Amino acid sequence: MAFDQTLTTQAKLVALQALATGTLKMALYTADADLGAGTLVYSTANEVVGTGYTAGGNVLTSVTVLTSGTTAYLDFDNVVWNPANFTARGALIYNTNLGNLAVAVLDFGSDKTTTTTFTVQTPANTADAALIRFA
């Protein structure tokens, strides 16, 4: 008999489903924002301001929690602002049904500026590439 000390795949799935229950939103932020692992909740501090952007960001659509092997991961559609005229450095994904609980911080690597359409393109829908995953 062998033991493999681990968080079970089912526990990962249930935890991620709990985070994804309700409404998930993506808010965009300027380079002046201070977001990271210690971020607790959504804040308007240093949130993007500009044409086509509304405080609080956009609702994530087609949210699905999946598993592959021992990884649970979250998939959702690309997030689009159209029209758009603003600059963003990163984003916060948060859950409005859990007191605006911060779920994930995304760093775009540099300022991204648009005067037409702004799209946050999600990676492949796989356990190895998803933006939010419990491995």
Walk through the language-model features, giving the residues of each.
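Small cysteine-rich, disulfide-bonded extracellular modules of the LU/uPAR three-finger superfamily
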Residues: 1-89, 96-135
